Amino acid sequence: MRGSFFSRLPPQLSLLLLLSLRRVWTQEDIGTAPSKSPVAPECPEACSCSLGGKANCSALALPAVPADLSWQVRSLLLDHNRVSALPPGAFANAGALLYLDLRENRLRSVHARAFWGLGVLQWLDLSSNQLETLPPGTFAPLRALSFLSLAGNRLALLEPSILGPLPLLRVLSLQDNSLSAIEAGLLNNLPALDVLRLHGNPWTCNCALRPLCTWLRKHPRPASETETLLCVSPRLQTLSLLTAFPDAAFKQCTQSLAARDLAVVYALGPVSFLASLAICLALGSVLTACGARRRRRRRTTVRHLLRRQLDPEGPPSLEDAGSPVTAAIQA
């Protein structure tokens, strides 16, 4: 009877062959095992996350922005919560954010450095909050921003320094605020602006409206609703179309100082006041010294006159020329 194939081989070769076959079988088993699904990004507590870096924290009554955000989050939904303030670096741990939704919160305060680190953010929705003012430079770090909504707040003033230069911003929503005018230069920093929403604001028909009217005539496309925008005349209490005011209607308006000029005035005002005060004090001191000197001279003159009247000194008269005293003096 012939032996098996392994019995004919040397023991060392048989062992090597068995080990090789075992390795092949193990690799086949691993290859046929079901693959695991991709792991979702790190998710903030109480939020739900999905593939693609989306973190859904909507309607959870959150009082603040979650502190455990990660760089894996690309889209953050924080709408319909109770967030009342955005501190400095509120999203510093989520520097890869592309989409940020903060609608329907209780936002009243936004720090000037709240959005620092979000250089790639493209979409920001702050609508339906309680914002009355924003500090200068709030949106300056958001150089990639293409959509910004501030609708449904209580904003009464928007300075150019608040928005800053946003070269890629295409959509700006300012409707349903308390804006009566827009300062000159605010919209000039938005070269790519394609959609501008201005409805629902109490625009006032006065000189402060001139920058907005001028800009709307030069850029009719972004504000497609221009033909229906109305302003209120304070004196006549009538409504007028913003497009009904040409440049000639603002001839009586004096050009207001720019923000840079106002800053110079504010900076030099106290300095000039102190300089004027110092000059006045110096002149007062000089006049006081001159007056005192004149009074001293006057008192000296009066004193000499009194001495002459009480003890006159002078040459002897002709009547006393023959007296012994006079002769002795002359001798």
Swiss-Prot record:
<feature type="repeat" description="LRR 4">
    <location>
        <begin position="144"/>
        <end position="165"/>
    </location>
</feature>
<feature type="topological domain" description="Extracellular">
    <location>
        <begin position="27"/>
        <end position="261"/>
    </location>
</feature>
<dbReference type="Pfam" id="PF13855">
    <property type="entry name" value="LRR_8"/>
</dbReference>
<keyword id="KW-0406">Ion transport</keyword>
<keyword id="KW-0433">Leucine-rich repeat</keyword>
<dbReference type="InterPro" id="IPR001611">
    <property type="entry name" value="Leu-rich_rpt"/>
</dbReference>
<keyword id="KW-1133">Transmembrane helix</keyword>
<keyword id="KW-1003">Cell membrane</keyword>
<keyword id="KW-0407">Ion channel</keyword>
<feature type="domain" description="LRRCT">
    <location>
        <begin position="201"/>
        <end position="255"/>
    </location>
</feature>
<feature type="disulfide bond">
    <location>
        <begin position="207"/>
        <end position="253"/>
    </location>
</feature>
<keyword id="KW-0813">Transport</keyword>
<feature type="disulfide bond">
    <location>
        <begin position="47"/>
        <end position="57"/>
    </location>
</feature>
<dbReference type="GO" id="GO:0008076">
    <property type="term" value="C:voltage-gated potassium channel complex"/>
</dbReference>
<feature type="topological domain" description="Cytoplasmic">
    <location>
        <begin position="283"/>
        <end position="331"/>
    </location>
</feature>
<feature type="disulfide bond">
    <location>
        <begin position="205"/>
        <end position="231"/>
    </location>
</feature>
<dbReference type="GO" id="GO:0015459">
    <property type="term" value="F:potassium channel regulator activity"/>
</dbReference>
<feature type="repeat" description="LRR 3">
    <location>
        <begin position="120"/>
        <end position="141"/>
    </location>
</feature>
<feature type="domain" description="LRRNT">
    <location>
        <begin position="34"/>
        <end position="71"/>
    </location>
</feature>
<keyword id="KW-1015">Disulfide bond</keyword>
<dbReference type="GO" id="GO:0005249">
    <property type="term" value="F:voltage-gated potassium channel activity"/>
</dbReference>
<dbReference type="InterPro" id="IPR000483">
    <property type="entry name" value="Cys-rich_flank_reg_C"/>
</dbReference>
<keyword id="KW-0206">Cytoskeleton</keyword>
<feature type="repeat" description="LRR 5">
    <location>
        <begin position="168"/>
        <end position="191"/>
    </location>
</feature>
<dbReference type="InterPro" id="IPR032675">
    <property type="entry name" value="LRR_dom_sf"/>
</dbReference>
<keyword id="KW-0732">Signal</keyword>
<dbReference type="GO" id="GO:0044325">
    <property type="term" value="F:transmembrane transporter binding"/>
</dbReference>
<feature type="repeat" description="LRR 1">
    <location>
        <begin position="72"/>
        <end position="93"/>
    </location>
</feature>
<feature type="signal peptide">
    <location>
        <begin position="1"/>
        <end position="26"/>
    </location>
</feature>
<keyword id="KW-0812">Transmembrane</keyword>
<dbReference type="GO" id="GO:0099104">
    <property type="term" value="F:potassium channel activator activity"/>
</dbReference>
<dbReference type="InterPro" id="IPR003591">
    <property type="entry name" value="Leu-rich_rpt_typical-subtyp"/>
</dbReference>
<dbReference type="GO" id="GO:0005737">
    <property type="term" value="C:cytoplasm"/>
</dbReference>
<dbReference type="InterPro" id="IPR051432">
    <property type="entry name" value="KCNMA1_auxiliary"/>
</dbReference>
<comment type="subunit">
    <text>Interacts with KCNMA1.</text>
</comment>
<keyword id="KW-0963">Cytoplasm</keyword>
<feature type="transmembrane region" description="Helical">
    <location>
        <begin position="262"/>
        <end position="282"/>
    </location>
</feature>
<feature type="region of interest" description="Disordered">
    <location>
        <begin position="310"/>
        <end position="331"/>
    </location>
</feature>
<comment type="function">
    <text>Auxiliary protein of the large-conductance, voltage and calcium-activated potassium channel (BK alpha). Required for the conversion of BK alpha channels from a high-voltage to a low-voltage activated channel type in non-excitable cells. These are characterized by negative membrane voltages and constant low levels of calcium.</text>
</comment>
<dbReference type="GO" id="GO:0005856">
    <property type="term" value="C:cytoskeleton"/>
</dbReference>
<feature type="repeat" description="LRR 2">
    <location>
        <begin position="96"/>
        <end position="117"/>
    </location>
</feature>
<keyword id="KW-0677">Repeat</keyword>
